């Protein structure tokens, strides 16, 4: 019997469209002999939909019409089953789901919001858990964690919107102390949205204004000199991680834009469309160092499934800086696994999710006590 896999994608996110592309790539390449595909699309206003019309990329040209053709659903638990309940009257169960596969990108979805709900109802799911997802979405928390554990990160500062409003001159001085040029980022977004390189104080002010459109938490980093951008994917869980080939991302620009990452090769290719050299033109020593850092970073976060870790290399000093980890990478980084088919990669991710669920099911999730039986009024409330 085929396992029913509910692919969750879309959502209230600046990376909504990229999530759609990544999910459709996965649904088109998953092993159809092992798995039954159930699309679960989250609209831009946060409603969940399912239906066969969601499987065709051309239907996403008109999202309003697509949602009308599809069934509005809610993910629920009924008994021991996880179901898609039709929201509109008459209510009915449209499908059961054996395992969920979130392929979501960005704030509000990839940050643990989706897997947090799945955890709440006890549902099995592929990819990393709530904790890794939350840390993976916040570039500042990542840097603090990695630096504390001996992994190099580029010099940086961070602040919140109110900090800048109340202490602009102090923050601008901290930025200047990093030395220009710097890169200004929303701390909890991805896909290069809201990111700007600033070469002077006026640039910094404009860059902060742009980044604040997307997030109240801002990260400013020193631009690495003699820069070469490198990416490495990691597959597995805490028991066994494996690093992919390392790619060198090429661009004539100072920084890869959203368009560079996703649209250069056509609107259906996702991250696979970016200009890249695989394997990267780097020494064996640098390759080994990046692989070792990647496995260490994944162990620290206890990632599961597939992730991508982005690096900055100073080609003059050979210093390697971990830039950020992507908990659910665009296109699931399938293009970095030349020795594994897209189909087998997806099977591996799903099987890791099943293993994670089985391991967690063995742990006690409740504690027997008679507190409620003896509870009388509010006297027993913890103060």
Regions found by a protein language model. Name each.
Residues 1-131, 135-137, 141, 160-169:
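ATP-binding N-terminal substructure of ATP-dependent carboxylate-amine bond-forming enzymes
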Residues 3-9, 13-28, 90-94, 135-226:
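Active-site nucleotide/adenylate-binding loops and adjacent lid/helix of ATP-dependent enzymes
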Residues 106, 192, 252-255, 326-338:
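Glycine-rich phosphate/pyrophosphate-binding beta-alpha loops
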Residues 159, 195-200, 234-237, 314, ...:
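Short beta-strand-to-turn element immediately C-terminal to the catalytic PLP-Schiff-base lysine
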Residues 199-270, 281, 285, 320:
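Phosphate-binding site of ATP-dependent enzymes
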Residues 210-217, 262-314:
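A long amphipathic alpha-helix within ATP-dependent nucleotide-binding catalytic cores
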Residues 219-222, 304-308, 359-365:
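Flexible, glycine/charged-enriched surface loops at secondary-structure junctions
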Residues 285, 315-383:
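C-terminal active-site "lid" helix and adjoining low-complexity regulatory extension at the edge
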């Amino acid at each position: 019997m085929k396992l029913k896999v509910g692919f969750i994608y879309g959502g209230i996110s600046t990376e909504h469209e990229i999530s759609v592309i990544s999910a459709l790539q996965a649904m088109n390449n998953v092993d159809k002999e092992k798995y039954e595909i159930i699309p679960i699309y989250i609209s831009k206003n946060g409603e969940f939909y399912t239906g066969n019309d969601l499987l065709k990329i051309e239907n996403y040209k008109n999202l309003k019409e697509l949602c009308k053709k599809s069934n509005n659903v809610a993910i629920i638990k009924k008994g021991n089953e996880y179901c898609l309940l039709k929201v509109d009257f008459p209510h009915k169960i449209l499908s059961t789901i054996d395992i969920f596969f979130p392929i979501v990108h960005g704030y509000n979805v990839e940050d643990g919001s989706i897997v947090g709900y799945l955890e709440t109802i006890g549902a099995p799911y592929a990819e990393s858990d709530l904790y890794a997802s939350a840390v993976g979405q916040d570039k500042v928390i990542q840097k603090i964690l990695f630096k504390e554990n001996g992994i190099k990160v580029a010099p940086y500062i961070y602040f919140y919107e109110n900090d800048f409003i109340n202490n602009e001159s102090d923050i601008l001085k901290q930025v200047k102390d990093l030395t220009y040029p710097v890169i200004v980022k929303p701390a909890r977004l991805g896909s290069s949205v809201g990111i700007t390189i600033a070469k002077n104080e006026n640039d910094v002010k404009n860059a902060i204004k742009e980044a604040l459109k997307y997030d109240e938490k801002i990260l400013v980093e020193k631009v690495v000199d003699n820069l070469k951008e490198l990416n490495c994917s990691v597959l597995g869980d805490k028991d066994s991680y494996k690093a992919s080939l390392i790619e060198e991302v090429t661009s004539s620009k100072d920084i890869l834009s959203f368009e560079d990452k996703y649209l250069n090769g056509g609107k259906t290719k996702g991250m696979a469309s970016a200009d890249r050299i695989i394997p990267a033109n780097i020494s064996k020593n640098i390759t080994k160092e990046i692989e070792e850092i990647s496995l260490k970073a994944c162990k620290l976060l206890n990632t599961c499934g597939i992730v991508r870790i982005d690096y900055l290399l100073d080609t003059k000093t050979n210093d390697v800086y971990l830039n950020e980890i992507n908990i659910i990478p665009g296109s699931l980084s399938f293009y970095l696994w030349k020795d594994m088919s897209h189909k087998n990669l997806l099977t591996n991710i799903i099987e890791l999710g099943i293993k994670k669920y089985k391991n967690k099911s063995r742990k006690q999730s409740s504690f027997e006590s008679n507190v409620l039986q003896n509870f009388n009024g509010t006297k027993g409330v913890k103060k």
